[in-house]
Amino acid sequence: MYTLYGIKNCDSVKKARQWLDKHKVEYQFHDFRVHGLTPEQLQIFIERAGWESVLNKRSTSWRQVDEGQKADLNAEKAAVLMLANLTLIKRPVLVAGEQLFIGFNAENYQTLL
């Protein structure tokens, strides 16, 4: 079974859930706001996709991050920031076995069928 990580009211997460439901793909939904995220879970995302892909620099949350924290960012500092503010993680994150998908893209999800 796959796990879809995100926030219930996020538009991209809604699209991903609708796509998975429509194509009858079994998955478990993990809401960051309800269940949180462990450092180990985030580390898996970072190892498979790279911290630059996981960190959402387009989010309103990113714009609120102090400039000092943005300077000299690396994987370790980014992980600390993302764990402190889960809305900095690009959504949704779909873990499908060894595959990991960041953001919703129907063409990429098609490979699951």
Q: Whereabouts are the PLM-identified features?
A:
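Local sequence-structure signature of Cys/Sec-based thiol-disulfide redox active-site neighborhoods
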Residues: 1-18, 22-23, 28-32
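Thiol/selenol-based redox catalytic cores and closely related redox-interacting motifs
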Residues: 32-112
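Alpha-helix C-terminal capping segments
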Residues: 20, 112-113
